[in-house]
A protein has these predicted regions:
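Glycine-rich, small/hydroxylated-residue low-complexity segments
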Residues: 4-8, 16-361
Length: 361
């Protein structure tokens, strides 16, 4: 009797799992299409820095898995990035259907999920330099998990790579979002062994780079939160000898909403922690840019109008991509033209600077 009961339970679970897997599998393609539509609608509104179109192809839906390719096409190219019109960034996507994706079960995770996915960058004309820099390994690989409530988590693994004079070791970043909104996002990450070769005899190294960010969007228009990016244990090296050391270089951003008002305050802070030259400790410093009472709607309009104008300039004058001075002049002219949009809220700007010696004075 016990054996029959156990068999019945197993059969029931198999039916439930199979039915759930079939159902969640039917939700993948509509979800992909909605994501693409939202992305392309944002392009039409001028919210992207470049004229890009998102699409998918080769959708193959199985019972436990769905596979397809996601591709982002630069319609008019990106001259400042040496991207030609029509070039694409392509991703191979392998989705495991919920409610219990097999890979997650193999790792002991029995929490039901809508789907889990593996995303890999495709080696093509545009992305080939990334694969060469990573010594023919995939430069980035992503693992995603989508919950039934709309939240998601992503782990991004970064391969060691060397891009000319800049190199780094392996790294990993995690992204956790609420309601499938990239505006409500927690980010943590770390990359090891960073090297910037300034010349054959001079270089700057950092033991690691870390990032910790928590951001959300209130009422769909007020960005708030804080982030911290840090280069740890920096060494400035000349002819093989350490010239100076810095315990950490930190960049912090804080955004908070002004109470009972449609404004936000922004605080950008850069910190230099424990600068040492030879045997001499020179202290620590801090520089901040504080902007109070900023209208986020005005900032959004500024970015949109600026992006649209810059896209038109680059499309009409592709030679700007190879003329840094001319490009800076265009940037300055566009910034001046659309600056009145930012000045609607009449923000208050402060730039405090602090420095303490080794004695804390």
């Amino acid at each position: 009797m016990i054996r029959k009961s156990a068999t019945g339970v197993i059969v029931a679970l198999a039916v439930i799992w199979g039915g759930g897997t079939w159902y969640t599998g039917t939700q993948i393609q509509p979800g992909v299409e909605k994501f693409i539509k939202d992305f392309n609608d944002a392009k039409k509104k001028g919210e992207h820095a470049y004229d890009m179109t998102l699409s998918y192809q080769n959708f193959d839906k199985g019972f436990f898995n769905s596979r397809f390719q996601m591709q982002m096409t630069f319609d008019n190219g990106a001259p400042d990035l040496n991207i030609k019109p029509g070039q694409k960034v392509v991703f191979d996507v392998d989705v495991e259907h919920g409610p219990l994706p097999i890979t997650m079960l193999m790792h002991g995770n029995v929490i039901p999920a809508l789907a889990a996915a593996k995303v890999n960058l495709v080696n093509n004309e545009l992305t080939q330099p990334l694969f060469i820099a990573a010594k023919n390994k995939s430069p980035v690989e992503a693992t995603l998990r989508f919950a039934f409530g709309g939240s998601f988590s992503t782990t991004l693994d970064v391969a060691p790579a060397e891009y000319g004079k800049f190199s780094f070791g392996e790294g990993q970043f995690t992204f956790n979002g609420d309601g499938s909104s990239l505006s409500n996002l927690d980010i943590e990450g770390k990359v090891e062994d960073i090297v910037l070769q300034l010349s054959p005899m001079n270089k700057v190294t950092a033991k690691s780079f870390t990032i910790d960010s928590l951001a959300r969007l209130e009422e769909k228009k007020f960005p708030v939160g804080e982030s911290e990016s840090k280069f740890n244990q920096i060494n400035i090296i000349n002819h093989g000898e350490d010239v100076a050391q810095i315990d950490a270089f930190v960049a912090k951003t804080m955004l908070d909403r002004v109470k009972d008002k449609d404004y936000i305050n922004v605080n950008l802070t850069y910190e230099l922690d424990k600068l040492t030259k030879g045997n001499q400790q020179l202290g620590s410093g801090e520089w901040s840019l504080i902007a109070e009472s900023i209208d986020p709607s005005a900032v959004r309009q500024f970015i949109i109008q600026y992006n649209i104008a810059m896209q038109k300039q680059l499309a009409a004058h592709p030679e700007l991509a190879n003329d840094e001075v001319a490009l800076q002049e265009v940037n300055a002219a566009l910034f001046k033209e659309y600056l009145p949009l930012l000045q609607k809220s009449e923000p208050t700007i402060k730039q405090p600077v602090k420095w303490k010696n080794a004695l804390g004075e």
